[in-house]
């Protein structure tokens, strides 16, 4: 079993986006600590299975970030369950989770499941619109969400999601200073190695996503930038 607490760099692949077999191989053989499969829309059991089968040809750990209960399938190493703490809709905080547990609770392997406390900070992002996230928040608000995840809910992961735009480095630094046991994941807008390295100075885990589809070479350079190898 892998230890997620040591992961510094992960790639996130959207099953609803096209990725060539050649580029997938580059991603999986890049030295990244893991590959997360997940997206905000168009996620189906068919495209999730396609990604799973493709990634399983390689040794890299593989995680399904669950956004649709209908697209869950066995075979992943871990399952990340996001709870959008700044959503205005209770369904994205605990609602869909309750429904899933009602249906699948008896057969779930709890050693494979990790809850993520999300704070979505880009109002233009699909995930913000889907979850009706309250993005016009102050630094004090974000720190309060971090404390909620870390100290009250005791979640293993607090995820700052800027999705599509590069985030506030000082805010990331200040949030990290508040966390005692939760690991800080940062995702959003990383388009080059320099940005990845900058965020890695503060976040425990840097998530690289969209740049994979825009500039595969730039995406691959983020691995060494984050891990310093």
Swiss-Prot record:
HAMAP family: GGGP_HepGP_synthase. Keywords: Lipid biosynthesis, Lipid metabolism, Magnesium, Metal-binding, Phospholipid biosynthesis, Phospholipid metabolism, Transferase. The gene is pcrB. GO terms for molecular function: heptaprenylglyceryl phosphate synthase activity; magnesium ion binding. The keyword Magnesium applies. One of its GO terms (biological process) is glycerophospholipid biosynthetic process. This is Heptaprenylglyceryl phosphate synthase. It comes from Bacillus cereus (strain ATCC 10987 / NRS 248). Belongs to the GGGP/HepGP synthase family. Group I subfamily. Disulfide bonds: none annotated. InterPro entries: GGGP/HepGP_synthase_I, GGGP/HepGP_synthase_sf, GGGP_HepGP_synthase. Its EC number is 2.5.1.n9. Mg(2+) binds at residues 14, 40. It comes from the Bacteria. It holds the Pfam family PcrB. Prenyltransferase that catalyzes in vivo the transfer of the heptaprenyl moiety of heptaprenyl pyrophosphate (HepPP; 35 carbon atoms) to the C3 hydroxyl of sn-glycerol-1-phosphate (G1P), producing heptaprenylglyceryl phosphate (HepGP). This reaction is an ether-bond-formation step in the biosynthesis of archaea-type G1P-based membrane lipids found in Bacillales. Sn-glycerol 1-phosphate binds at residues 12, 159-164, 189, 209-210.
């Amino acid at each position: 079993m892998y230890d997620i607490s040591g992961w510094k760099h992960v790639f996130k692949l959207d099953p609803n986006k096209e990725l060539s077999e050649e580029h997938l191989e580059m991603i999986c053989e890049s030295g990244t600590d893991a590959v997360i499969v997940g997206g905000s829309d168009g996620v189906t059991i068919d495209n999730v299975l396609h990604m799973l089968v493709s990634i399983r040809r390689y040794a890299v750990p593989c995680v399904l970030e669950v956004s649709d209960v209908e697209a869950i399938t066995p075979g992943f190493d871990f399952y990340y369950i996001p709870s959008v703490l700044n959503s205005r809709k209770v369904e994205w905080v605990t609602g869909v989770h309750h429904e899933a547990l009602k249906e699948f609770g008896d057969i779930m392997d709890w050693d494979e499941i990790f809850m993520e406390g999300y704070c979505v900070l880009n109002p233009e992002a699909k995930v913000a619109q889907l979850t009706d996230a309250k993005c016009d928040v102050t630094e004090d608000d974000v720190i309060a969400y971090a404390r909620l995840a870390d100290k009250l809910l005791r979640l293993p992961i607090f995820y700052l999601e800027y999705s599509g735009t590069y985030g506030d480095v000082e805010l990331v630094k200040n949030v990290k200073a508040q966390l005692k046991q939760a690991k800080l994941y940062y995702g959003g807008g990383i388009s080059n190695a320099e940005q990845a390295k900058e965020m890695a100075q503060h976040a425990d885990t840097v998530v690289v996503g969209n740049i994979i589809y825009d500039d595969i070479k730039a995406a691959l350079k983020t691995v060494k930038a984050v891990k310093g190898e």
